[in-house]
UniProtKB/Swiss-Prot annotation:
One of its GO terms (molecular function) is mechanosensitive monoatomic ion channel activity. GO terms for cellular component: plasma membrane. This is Transmembrane channel-like protein 3. Its main location: membrane. The keyword Membrane applies. It comes from Homo sapiens.
Amino acid sequence: MKTSKASQRYRGIRRNASQCYLYQESLLLSNLDDSFSADETGDSNDPEQIFQNIQFQKDLMANIRCRPWTMGQKLRALRQAKNIVLKFEGRLTRTRGYQAAGAELWRKFARLACNFVVIFIPWEMRIKKIESHFGSGVASYFIFLRWLFGINIVLTIMTGAFIVIPELIAGQPFGSTARKTIPKEQVSSAQDLDTVWSLGGYLQYSVLFYGYYGRERKIGRAGYRLPLAYFLVGMAVFAYSFIILLKKMAKNSRTSLASASNENYTFCWRVFCAWDYLIGNPEAAESKTAAIVNSIREAILEEQEKKKSKNLAVTICLRIIANILVLLSLAGSIYLIYFVVDRSQKLEQSKKELTLWEKNEVSVVVSLVTMIAPSAFDLIAALEMYHPRTTLRFQLARVLVLYLGNLYSLIIALLDKVNSMSIEEMATKNNTSHWIDSTTFFATRTAPEEEKWSTSRPGMGLRRNNTWALEETSISAYTMPLIKANKTSLHTQSPQDQCWETYVGQEMLKLSIIDMLFTVASILLIDFFRGLFVRYLSDYWCWDLESKFPEYGEFKIAENVLHLVYNQGMIWMGAFFSPCLPAFNVLKLIGLMYLRSWAVLTCNVPHQQVFRASRSNNFYLAMLLFMLFLCMLPTIFAIVRYKPSLNCGPFSGQEKIYDIVSETIEKDFPVWFGSVVGHISSPVVILPAVLLLFMLIYYLQSIARSLKLSNHQLKMQIQNARSEDKKKVAQMVEARIQTQEESTKKLPNDSDLTSQLSSAHSGTPQNNGNVAHFDSGSSKSGRIETVAQSMPQSPRPGDRAPSSPLPGVPKSRLEHETNRYLHGLCASTSDLHRNRSRTPMTFTTHIEDVHSEPLFRKDFQQINPPHRGPQASTLLAQGPRPHAPRYYVINECDSYKKKHLNVWPERHFKIDASGDIVELYPRNVRQYASRVPRQPPSPQLSEEEEETPSRDWIKRSLPPRSLIDLRRAPHFYIGERSESQTRDPEHQGRVHYKSWNEDFEGHLERPAYVPRKPRSRNFQYPQPPLKPRGKPRFEPSLTESDSVSAASSSDQQNSSADQYLQVTHSQGRFPRSVGQPSRRKAKSGQELTVDLDDLICSDV
């Protein structure tokens, strides 16, 4: 029966303790029940309230998994929420329902669209794999390549949709006009390899180049203005490139400014927060692991670079030498390219047929220079000893200057040739017009009537392959051949071939093709075959090829990134003269992506110094923007400076290329629009507009600087706030530690408790019969300890010898038990176990639950004094001992403020005549402790105990909020030490504990809480009658605690020698023991007498 009651009480305690933890959730459940019941009755008819309730229920259904409820509660709440939503959602208006449904559908669609778009991001998984194995620096190259691929896709669409496709659809077909027909002398060699390689023959007279497009203002039935579209698209290519570059740079700047600095907790974030727990693929897990390792290596390198010491003088000298070598390399490469271009021009003028090398030597030399020079710069950069990121930027800048120098030297040479071709064309035009205007020459022979002659009609200018029949005679008028006008140009190109725009486009496309071939060759030779050589011949070589020369290749970020910039610069420079060049670049970038990624994953090894790339990559974009600006200048210069070719292109016949705009405005727009455009384009408007733009740029730049400064200040404030927070946390921890140290120092430093304990254990007690009160320093637990002592009048004749162990208990086991920490509930919460320091004394410890073990007195007598050891002290219950002082030590730990009215048992107090407080405990609350054999109690009480007035019962309790608020079990400690021992704070930690039962029962071992069997009611106790004195009083009989003593408590001589060490709490009350029933049945008078007889008198 008691076991069931104990289990019921235990379950009640657990239920009460869980109420505090689930208080918020129970409120939510109760609100849910209330709302459900209110909605069931139909009290809520407000649409707004219904809508809010429905939203609340939907949020609850969405977050039901996160609630700390049981499964039954979750299911019940989910059912109720669904019922409410299904029942009352129809009360809302259809508009609001449609709006909510539409918003939800839009969110779902946007999420699905985002997930769907991610699938179409090209090469995403490939780039992630490369980044995981080679770091963010190598991955930035492939991200940059993918971004350039996107730009070229847009440029291809622009040129293809507005230029190439309209010309193919609505323009004149191939062979219909002279500019779309291959000359007869070139037809035989049009399909030769060298002709195709040099982009001649059929490729020259195709949509690839400028000369194929017609000059008709309108083509097709729709009247599409192809020349105007060609010019506007050419300008739009540069405009779009500028806009997308600036937009990307601004976005990256915002991202880098908005991103939090990860300089704090550098390694903690990488070690503890870097793993992605959504990874379910072993390959992805391997890649993520490699990425984390690389990021840690990057962080380690950053920390090492911060602490690197440098010799300033040597470093400056080495950097000066490195810059001199770089300048010499740049000057040599520029001179070499200019020399090769000039030589090729001279060869074209002096030779009629050129070899394959002579036709392609310019492109080959430029590609060789661009491939070899960056490696030389890489060797030179090793002298400078910069940070790897700074080294990369210097390398990028130098290679950029090299590429720009190569391109500009090439462009200058090409423009010289364009200038010479323009002069020849002008001379040809002037000579032709002179011969036509002066006279007409007749042929020296009569031609057959059916024979057709190539001639020019009078007044039509220079034309070829135009035939017309003479009237009446077969005499044909012809123009003097060009060899008459210029005898030095025997092997000059025909007027149809003198198209400098097509020549520039051919050179740019040829340069791009040869650059691609050299890139493929360098990847195969430098990376692939080198890796094969190192891999398979390292075992047979004289040295280790993998760790020494030539070793495996590393991915060179600087020159590869600059190679992309250089390639895109060639596209921008030649896009106006070759509209299909962006389309070719798209194919080139696709092949480059797959080839480079294969080479990196197969043939390259990670860098020895892996450094973190810039978060924004704005340095790459800045170089690309600079390259765009410099590549736009030659094109703009050619458009403005040179006259378009007369025999090819959509602008033939115009004085300048941009005249097509003014011509279109004059012919296709009203007069007033032309006048407005003329006024706007006048210098009176242009100059103030330019000045206004400069002022606007300056203003925006000032705002940008101020925002940057404020952003820096905000970052510093955040860092200061973080440091202050860390300081506050450190101060709180330090204050807590100091408080604990102070509370620890207070108890051992108190002289009252020390004197009491020393007098209690000394052979000559102090001549003091008063009551001493002591307030414990452990004020955190709300405990006030009172030590009451009654000293004997005469000292003992001799000192006490150390006590010996119990018979039958091994010494090693006893020492082990005395040095063992306490277990159970009090072992984790008691201040006496953890927060207090102790003197190096040997304690015989009585661990008891106040609510389950009655307090009882014992007489202690030494047995076998010569055999007691210094580390253990054993006290045994013996018979009467008139001169031995008796010690009563009662200590309750961790009293709490929170009590429960229906849980804690009532407390009974009495005050005897001497002023001592006596607290009565019923015997039936004890359940756990084992008892020692008891002797029959004394037959009667002392007169002082009989005349002690009783105190009122105290009834105050509060319910426990949680399990930790339950009262801990009080414990009792009886300490013994020699007189010579002092409480040194340095040795307060060496405390030896012994349980009460170990002292008296030897091998008896009991756990902290073991339910004991109920005591038999057959045991008879004397039941003296109660003496009512005014108020109801209870005078209990002699308790079992007095049975240990052979002398009666009425003996004044012995009672005067008793010593009491009392520790009482001031705030808490004893909680009910675990397993006790919470309610007690009403008892009859006889049962009440028996229970009162069972009360145990204890001096507290």
